[in-house]
């Protein structure tokens, strides 16, 4: 089975059904909330919350279902028959893709195989019924899921979003197709993995957690069903899917809403006071299952499961644990520590000897992904940076929401620009170990107009993932911005005008033209522009970047 909507640990998704259901629905795992404070009977309350979804005839008694919708979110269109969940009109998905057989059916959602008409490439399309989006929180959940998928785009073990579309009845999320089935299926088929294979799988899973956390995202619903195989013949071609319960977080932020799946939920989530450490707990539960075939906290009822989670006793006596290595058990204990402060971070898990043994995972610090993007950005020439700013300003809100969160977190004085001290403090919060000199280099690289600060558009341009550049409409729009007279060429005069508009002085225009101009006609055509934008960054703009850095040092 390919990409699928969420299901429970026991219930398998339907597959092979070619008939499209009359209604799609929002994909969601159990999402718990309670307006009451935690009490000694918390397990009873939580169990009741988990069972609410099974009482479909009691919707009128659920206060979450009668929250009025905010008008800016639920905008009516001219025919008064639908609203825009995404906040804007999108192309008709059926003009771009052909939807065919069903890949999976979850509790509230359906995923279909879809084929891009222009290229013939297959993707997965998750369809969400707008009729099921009852509250403003439901709408915000869908928006946030799309925003987070855009924010995490480019990681090798995270499913890639292709685009989001909306019509009068549904929201459709088109994403990379994972045709190899679920990791869940492999666990059921084999019962358990060898320690070596379990270590390799754990490295992938925790690598996703580390990437999410470094970019300010907490997944909150990790489980085997949410990892799919791209290739059924490759056990390790895993991709994380389903970010419907994921949220953006700031360092030190505390969450109180109870979400997740019973077997995998961390004790602090049940106690309504948690942070990203809960994802590490969940990954530890998955590791336990990979090695034994059963979850560590087991009971016949949900209340019993919650009691076991809160007690925190881990069974290492039953088979096969007597023959499992001490190193593996040590890692599990440290991932399943009941105290979040004593639990390993995702990065520390990747450095644990059991994971690192035989070179499975490198024992070195990993900078957050945003830093690698900044480093790539520093190698670009000025034209490419200006083009990125043009593209960044045209991106949809869902594509840049995560970066906006990071910018606002770093811009502590709300001035609309990041100073060196704010950049340094912000990078430290996101786990950076860069030296001051390296941060200065990043600052200089991102500060396109040499103002001494990084404004919002410069930050977005410097940190947006480069796969956004592959979209033809963005490249065309950026080229047309520079080609003022519509001649099909960017001339040195037009480049000069663009530099003035962006407040860039002392730019070596001739050098920029020479670096991009392949046929030596003294101007840049569209093909040369596209090649520059899509070319590997390591060899782009080094001479111009050195000149720019020299200018910055002279100005200083």
From Swiss-Prot:
Binding site for ATP: 103-111, 126
Taxonomic lineage from the root: Eukaryota, Viridiplantae, Streptophyta, Embryophyta, Tracheophyta
Region annotated Autoinhibitory domain, chain positions: 361-391
Known EC number: 2.7.11.1
Any GO MF annotation of the entry: protein serine/threonine kinase activity
Primary localization: membrane
Positions of the UniProt region annotated as Disordered: 1-40
Descriptive protein name: Calcium-dependent protein kinase 5
Modified residues (Phosphoserine): 261
PROSITE patterns: EF_HAND_1 (PS00018), EF_HAND_2 (PS50222), PROTEIN_KINASE_ATP (PS00107), PROTEIN_KINASE_DOM (PS50011), PROTEIN_KINASE_ST (PS00108)
Activity regulation remarks: Activated by calcium. Autophosphorylation may play an important role in the regulation of the kinase activity.
Binding residues annotated for Ca(2+) 4, in chain numbering: 517, 519, 521, 523, 528
Binding site for Ca(2+) 1: 411, 413, 415, 422
UniProt similarity note: Belongs to the protein kinase superfamily. Ser/Thr protein kinase family. CDPK subfamily.
Binding residue positions for Ca(2+) 3: 483, 485, 487, 494
């Amino acid at each position: 089975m390919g990409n699928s909507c969420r299901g429970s640990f026991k219930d398998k998704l339907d597959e092979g059904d070619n008939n499209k259901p009359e209604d799609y629905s929002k994909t969601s795992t159990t999402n718990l909330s309670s307006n009451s404070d935690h009490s000694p009977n918390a397990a009873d309350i939580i169990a009741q919350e988990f069972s609410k979804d099974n009482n479909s005839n009691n919707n009128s008694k659920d206060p979450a279902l009668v929250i009025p919708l905010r008008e800016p979110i639920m905008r009516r269109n001219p025919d008064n028959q639908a609203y825009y969940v995404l906040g804007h009109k999108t192309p008709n998905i059926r003009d771009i893709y052909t939807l065919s057989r069903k890949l999976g059916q979850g509790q509230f959602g359906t995923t279909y195989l879809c084929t891009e008409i222009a290229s013939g490439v297959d993707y997965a399309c998750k369809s969400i019924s707008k009729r099921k989006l009852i509250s403003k929180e439901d709408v915000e959940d869908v928006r946030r899921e799309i925003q987070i998928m855009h924010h995490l785009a480019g990681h090798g073990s995270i499913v890639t979003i292709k685009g989001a579309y909306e019509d009068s009845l549904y929201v459709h999320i088109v994403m990379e197709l994972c045709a190899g089935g679920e990791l869940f299926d492999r666990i059921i088929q084999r019962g358990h993995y060898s320690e070596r294979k379990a270590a390799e799988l754990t490295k992938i899973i925790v690598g996703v957690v580390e990437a999410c956390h470094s970019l300010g995202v907490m997944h909150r619903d990790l489980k085997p069903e949410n990892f799919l195989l791209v290739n059924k013949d490759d056990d390790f071609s895993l991709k994380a899917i389903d970010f419907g319960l994921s949220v953006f977080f700031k360092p030190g932020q505390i969450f109180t809403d109870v979400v997740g799946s019973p077997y995998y939920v961390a004790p602090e989530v049940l106690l309504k006071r948690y942070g990203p450490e809960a994802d590490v707990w969940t990954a530890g539960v998955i590791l336990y299952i990979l090695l034994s075939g059963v979850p560590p906290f087991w009971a016949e009822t949900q209340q019993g499961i919650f009691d076991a989670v809160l007690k925190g006793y881990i069974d290492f006596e039953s088979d096969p644990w007597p023959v499992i290595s001490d190193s593996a058990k040590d890692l599990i204990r440290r991932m399943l520590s009941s105290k979040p402060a004593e639990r390993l971070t995702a990065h520390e898990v990747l450095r644990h000897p059991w994971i690192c043994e035989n070179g499975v995972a490198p024992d070195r610090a990993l900078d957050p992904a945003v830093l690698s993007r900044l480093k790539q950005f520093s190698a670009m020439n000025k034209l490419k940076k200006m083009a990125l700013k043009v593209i960044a300003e045209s991106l949809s809100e869902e594509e840049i929401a995560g970066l906006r969160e990071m910018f606002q977190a770093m811009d502590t004085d709300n001035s609309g620009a990041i100073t060196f001290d704010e950049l340094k403090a912000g990078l430290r919060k996101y786990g950076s170990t860069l030296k001051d000199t390296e941060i200065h280099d990043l600052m200089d690289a991102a500060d396109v107009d040499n103002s001494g600060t990084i404004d919002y558009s410069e930050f977005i341009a410097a940190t947006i993932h480069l796969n956004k550049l592959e979209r033809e409409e963005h490249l065309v729009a950026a080229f047309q911005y520079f080609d003022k007279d519509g001649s099909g060429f960017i001339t040195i005069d037009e480049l000069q005008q663009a530099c003035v508009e962006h407040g860039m002085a002392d730019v070596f225009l001739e050098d920029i033209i020479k670096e991009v101009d392949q046929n030596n006609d003294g101007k840049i055509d569209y093909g040369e522009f596209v090649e520059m934008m899509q070319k590997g960054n390591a060899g782009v703009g080094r001479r111009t970047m050195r000149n720019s850095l020299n200018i910055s040092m002279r100005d200083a």
